């Protein structure tokens, strides 16, 4: 549930 947020913020 952290890498998902990381990918979302990377966008």
From Swiss-Prot:
It is found in: Plastid, Chloroplast thylakoid membrane. It is a peripheral membrane protein. Keywords: ATP synthesis, CF(1), Chloroplast, Hydrogen ion transport, Ion transport, Membrane, Plastid, Thylakoid, Transport. GO terms for biological process: ATP biosynthetic process; proton transmembrane transport. One of its GO terms (cellular component) is proton-transporting ATP synthase complex. The keyword Lipoprotein does not apply. The keyword Glycoprotein does not apply. F-type ATPases have 2 components, CF(1) - the catalytic core - and CF(0) - the membrane proton channel. CF(1) has five subunits: alpha(3), beta(3), gamma(1), delta(1), epsilon(1). CF(0) has three main subunits: a, b and c. Produces ATP from ADP in the presence of a proton gradient across the membrane. Belongs to the ATPase epsilon chain family. This is ATP synthase epsilon chain, chloroplastic. It comes from Populus euphratica (Euphrates poplar). The gene is atpE.
